[in-house]
Amino acid sequence: MRNVSSPESWAYLSRVVEGPSIHIQEFIANGRSADEIAHGVRTRASWIGALGPQTQNRYTWDQPAQDLARARAAGYTLLTPDSPGWPGENIKPTFHCEYPDDDRKLSLNEEAVAPHALWVKGEADLAKLLAQSVGVVGTRTATQYGRHATDDLVRGLAKHQYTIVSGGALGIDTIAHQAALDCGAPTIVVAACGPGYVYPRSNEPLFDRVVRAGGAIVTEYPPGTTPDRHRFLTRNRLVAGLTQGTLLVEAAFRSGALNTLKWANAMNKQTMAVPGPITATESLGTNLAIQNKQAAMVLNADQIHEHIVHTGDFDAGEQMEMKYPPTLTQQLSHNELRIYDALPRAGEGSRTAEEIAADAGLSIGLAVHILMDLAKRGVVQRERKEWSRTE
């Protein structure tokens, strides 16, 4: 079990190492704590290796107490791998790339690295919020068609208990967040700036509403970090990496939203796109993504759900080699299996939905939704307010 490090050490590393760092992740994987790594950076220890040059210009920016105070003043907390609510199950299998082009694979893998800390405003249990989530992205100059499609798809996804994740930008991002809020679905804004900055400023009321409704604003960047162009590209990898799939609603040929789709493809996530009119410039990027098999064409929320649920939580090669039909549990999605494992066997008692949700680490809304679906399929049974397996 890894030693728990101080928030000050994580805050220091967040300040002096911008964005993802493969070197920090390697140290953590090899048993180094954030306290040790921070001390090594501060003292320029020889063992930090490549982390030395990476922090050469910033290691004296030693202000963790001030950063934590500034974050608190802006309503943010620092979430780390030591924190309850850290979305480890989403992060562990995600941040690596699979690209046939070796040069491109190397380039992507330099940035396809998990965050070492996240600054969060609102609901800090990201593990629960992201357990069933989809990224919804698209152009800043949405057409009426794009607006309508986004609203319709998000409302449909809400019925499947999805958390809607986007970047808070104008256009499709904004519509996705608004639609989620309007129908009571949780939503997460992944920001390209640090606490203390609101970008775009016109969306400040929307972001406040996201937090009040039980969602969250999430960023890798420490307080005062400005929303520069390169940070949007780095932010896109988080939208792709933290969710089970990415939906591209409307995007022109060089739309920045295509960068998020690229990340999702590289991370072997489900990538989906909404087809648009062949005469519409705003849909050229989405149509080409479908044509080039970079995204599956989807027409409604049920199709999106089908793609994500059947991504498979087992290795595809192993599935192909199965000699016999899958067992009941092998047919369950990851979240369904979490619920199933939290249930007593038939004849061995029963549990309330609240107890099951707590044990499974899911929200009560998502847990009840899954229980009802499993009941329809004859997998679980309900006796008054309590549930158990059917076998």
Give the predicted meaning of each segment.
Residues 1-7, 15-18, 82-391:
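Glycine-biased, small-residue-rich flexible motifs in mid-sequence functional cores and linkers
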Residues 1-109:
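N-terminal positively charged helical leader segments and presequences
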